[in-house]
Every structure is written in C-alpha cells, then in structure tokens.
C-alpha cells in the first residue's frame, strides 16, 4: 500500500487540530492551534472564520511535517467539526460577510420566540428532531440576513453561501469548487427534514432563507473533492465528514442500535445509536442523525450540556483557582466530598433535558467551611451530574437501560471524574485506549470511502478499552447526592 496514512481535521470550539493516523489507527503525529473567542455582548459568541481557516490549514501542514510524510503518502482527509456554528460568505471573493456565530451564542432567542408564537414548535420537532433553541444554525442565519447591512439582498441574488464549519473548510480546501455538507451536520441546522433527508421548504420559508445559500448534502463517507496542501504536491481526496459528536460515536464504533458514548469537550454530549428508527424524545432530548456501519444514515438520541470542560476553563481563567485543567483531580481528591457545595454551570442557560435559556449559574450550599478544594470538586461533579440527567432521560425515551457507556474527550484523563461518573450513574464507564475518538471517527469515515480500510469489522480490533470504571457507592448515597443536585438546579431557574 503506497498510501499509508489518513488525516483527520478536527475543528473544535477553541482550537483546530490535524492528526495523522496509520493503518493500525495509531496516532502518528498531530498539530493544534488555538484561535480567538469573540464576546461582543453577554450571551453572544463569535469566531473569525478566516482565523479558523488559517489555524486549520497551518495544522495540516505542520502535522505532515511532524509525521515526516508528504501528500502522496496520504490516502484521504476526513473532517470533523464543531456543529451548528454558522458562516455566510461571498462565493466570488470567499470573504465572510460577518463573523461566524458560534453554537453557544444565544442572540437569536427572540427569533426562536417568534417561531414559537407562529405555532411552529411541534413541526420543528417532528421534522428536524430539534427544539426551537438559539443553539441551532437556522435562527443564526436569519439573524445575519436581518441584521448585517445588504446581506439579505445579496443572498436573494444568489451571491452568498452558507455553511457549518465542515462546509466552510471543504470550500476553502477545494479553492471554492465544492459546496457540500453531510447529513450529521445538516441535521443540526433546524432546516433539514431528517426523515426525508432533504432541506425543508416550510422551514426555509418561515425563516426567510433562500435555498441558494444551502450546500448539497452527501453521505458522511464519500469522496467530495480533492485538495492540494499549500497548493503543492499530489492531490488528496477529502472523503469523510461528520459533526464532532456523531464522529465520536462512529470513532467509538457505536454503530449498532443501543450503543452509547459520552464526549467530554467544551460541552458534554451523550449520544445513543437508535438504528434505523428515529425515536421522538419525550424527555427534552434531540433526535439526530448518526452514521451506520456502512456509512448509511442511522438515527440517534442526543443530550447536550453546554458547559462541560468550559466549566473547568472558568475555574482557571475567571476565578484563578487552578493553573491547569489537570490540577482539578489533585485538588478534588484532597477532600472527601464537596461539603454540601453544588456548582450549577448554567452560564449560558441550561441545555438538555431542561432547555432553559434564561437559567443562570449558581454556587449553592456555601458555608464558612467551604474552601477552594470543595468548589473545584463541585465543578467536576457538576459535569457528571449533568451527564446523569441526560442518561436518565435517554433511558426513559429509548426503553433501554444502559449497563455501560463509552467515554472520550479531554476530560476522560481525569480518573476522579470518571469514577464519580460511574458512581452517580450506576453504570460502568469504559475509557478507550485512544481517547481522540472524534478525530478517529473522521479518519475512519475517510479511510472507508477510499478503501484504506475495507469495513467497520476491520476496525473493531483497533478500538480497545484502556480502563473500566465500576460504581463504588451504594444506592442510598447515590440518591442523596443526586437529590442535592436537583435542588441546586431548581434554584437557577
């Protein structure tokens, strides 16, 4: 095999990464660059789309150099990305008309309220599997069309293009030749009928979004186009796309009905593959699109928590309680419990299963005896409590009581958090040998599309488990802790 590697581009909320994998799914080299976060007003979050592209393209060049390989050694590139984040650009100049509006941004709440007043809430849920929340792309697009001078007119003339970050990166990588997305990203726009797998005219009309803005939707594992790295060398196929959470689900090989994973990133995201059936949630979860064993469309239930690792960043950057995220395990382990302290990190509202954009964060149960260690421990426990909220909702919706859950993302290196997650949910928590499963999913999708790997069966032995965390507390202890959490959440609403 002359082409011995695949590359995953992992474009996240705070950084862009490129990771080189070999045929045994080993990580050969990687590169990472952070980029700026823009906060124009409270509750507003933006990125500079050109800075995202610059950071992502430079990591691609750097990862190749670190692996000491050339473009002719690479079979394919796969892309995984922060979902929902919205870019609109001029298709002639390639220049964005406004900063990218990030998934965390709440500015389009009034637009959501208007759509609710029009009686569209149930239609949106039935058609897209989503809720009318500022989280999703559709209302962000409308905000740009309505609030940036001249943009609506240009959009109606067909001069502009919309994309989530995957679409933006493919467009840049192919020098403006390919305007495409995949079903997992399309399913997060609030504009995509997940049953018919097509853009929905009724929702486009309701939001006043011209059809010409939207990309073509192609399978998650397919050849979309070719790119030359820095305009040089052999062309490489761009052959896999999946939104970050669906990519992690695929990277964990949760490709059969009833398999689930929890990703601990900026937010926390619990997904369960429900196979070919789209399960409508009664518990405030989302119905979304996942990727099946052969790259086909499957469905999943998803619970999203906005503040996971971002809570730890807050401890570091705003409170100065820690120097590094890794310090949290040391400080949390210095105390036996939180001394009754609960942190509810509703900094931008609450996600699933509450969906309360007006909730605000709270530190509850403080006494004179509360110290730094208790607060740090409460922050870690909050991540696990929020995941328990999601797990309970998912069990009720699916009728499946999970016995184990696969985990990935940066925070899974924290043994304290993983053990507390097992304790509070009463399920086994399985940590993989390779925790970069989001990037791995994109690499798998791209490699399968070009025949680098023959099937998902070939991949199964490449996804080993490093450690299994088993619950260590009893039911009474678990109930007392979780009741305290529910009381704390009630105080934020």
Swiss-Prot record:
Domain of life: Bacteria
A GO CC annotation given for this chain: cytosol
GO BP terms: glycerol catabolic process; glycerol metabolic process; glycerol-3-phosphate metabolic process
Enzyme class: transferase
Keyword field contains Transferase: yes
Cysteines joined through disulfide linkages: none
Documented activity regulation: Inhibited by fructose 1,6-bisphosphate (FBP).
Gene Ontology terms, MF aspect: ATP binding; glycerol kinase activity
Residue positions binding glycerol: 83-84, 135, 244-245
Coiled-coil regions listed in the entry: none
Binding locations of ADP: 13, 17, 266, 309, 410, 414
UniProt pathway: Polyol metabolism; glycerol degradation via glycerol kinase pathway; sn-glycerol 3-phosphate from glycerol: step 1/1
Binding site for sn-glycerol 3-phosphate: 13, 83-84, 135, 244
Keywords: ATP-binding, Glycerol metabolism, Kinase, Nucleotide-binding, Transferase
EC number: 2.7.1.30
Record flagged with keyword Cell cycle: no
InterPro entries: ATPase_NBD, Carb_kinase_FGGY, Carb_kinase_FGGY_CS, FGGY_C, FGGY_N, Glycerol_kin
Catalytic activity: glycerol + ATP = sn-glycerol 3-phosphate + ADP + H(+)
Positions of ATP binding: 13-15, 266, 309, 313, 410
Family per similarity comment: Belongs to the FGGY kinase family.
NCBIfam families: glycerol_kin (TIGR01311), PRK00047.1 (NF000756)
Function: Key enzyme in the regulation of glycerol uptake and metabolism. Catalyzes the phosphorylation of glycerol to yield sn-glycerol 3-phosphate.
Name by which UniProt lists this protein: Glycerol kinase
Species of origin: Shewanella piezotolerans (strain WP3 / JCM 13877)
């Amino acid at each position: 095999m002359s082409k011995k590697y695949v590359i995953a581009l992992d474009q996240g909320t705070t950084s862009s990464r490129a990771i080189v994998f070999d045929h045994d799914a080993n990580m050969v080299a990687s590169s990472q660059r952070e980029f700026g976060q823009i906060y124009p007003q409270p509750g507003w979050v933006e990125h500079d789309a050109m800075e995202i592209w610059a950071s992502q393209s430079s990591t691609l060049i750097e990862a190749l150099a670190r692996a000491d390989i050339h473009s002719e050694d690479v079979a394919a590139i796969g892309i995984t990305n922060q979902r929902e984040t919205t870019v609109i650009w001029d298709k002639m100049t390639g220049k964005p008309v406004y900063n990218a509006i990030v998934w965390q941004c709440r500015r389009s709440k009034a637009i959501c309220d208007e759509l609710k007043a029009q009686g569209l809430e149930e239609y949106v849920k039935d058609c897209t599997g989503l809720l009318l929340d500022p989280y999703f792309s559709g209302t962000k697009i409308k905000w740009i069309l309505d609030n940036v001078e001249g943009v609506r007119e240009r959009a109606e003339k067909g001069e502009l293009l919309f994309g989530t970050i995957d679409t933006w990166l493919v467009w840049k990588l192919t020098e403006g030749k390919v305007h495409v997305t995949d079903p997992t990203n399309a399913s997060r726009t609030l504009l995509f009928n997940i049953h018919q797998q097509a853009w929905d005219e009724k929702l486009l009309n309701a939001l006043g979004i011209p059809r010409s803005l939207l990309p073509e939707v192609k399978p998650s594992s397919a050849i979309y186009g070719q790119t030359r790295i820095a305009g040089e060398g052999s062309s490489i196929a761009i052959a896999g796309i999946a939104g970050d959470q669906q990519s992690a689900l695929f990277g964990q090989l949760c490709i059969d009905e009833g398999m689930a994973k929890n990703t601990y990133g900026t937010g926390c995201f619990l997904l369960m593959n429900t196979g070919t059936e789209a399960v409508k949630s009664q518990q405030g979860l989302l119905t979304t699109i996942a990727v099946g064993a052969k790259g086909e469309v499957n469905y999943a239930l998803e619970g999203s928590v906005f503040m996971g690792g971002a809570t730890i960043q807050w401890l570091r950057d705003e409170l100065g309680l820690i120097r590094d995220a890794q310090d949290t395990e040391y400080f949390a382990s210095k105390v036996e419990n939180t001394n009754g302290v609960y942190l509810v990190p509703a900094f931008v509202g609450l996600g699933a299963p509450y969906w309360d954009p007006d909730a605000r964060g709270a530190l509850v149960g403080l006494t004179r005896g509360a110290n730094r260690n208790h607060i740090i421990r409460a922050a870690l426990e909050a991540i696990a409590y929020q995941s328990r909220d999601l797990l309970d909702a998912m069990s009720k919706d699916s009728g499946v009581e999970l016995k184990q859950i696969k985990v990935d993302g940066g925070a899974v290196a924290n043994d304290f958090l993983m053990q507390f997650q097992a304790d509070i949910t009463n399920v086994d928590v399985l940590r993989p040998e390779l925790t970069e499963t989001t990037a791995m999913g994109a690499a798998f999708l791209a490699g399968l599309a070009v025949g680098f790997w023959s099937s998902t069966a070939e991949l199964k032995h490449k996804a080993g488990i490093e450690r299994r965390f088993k619950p260590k507390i009893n039911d009474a202890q678990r109930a007392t802790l979780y009741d305290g959490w529910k009381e704390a959440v009630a105080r934020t609403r």
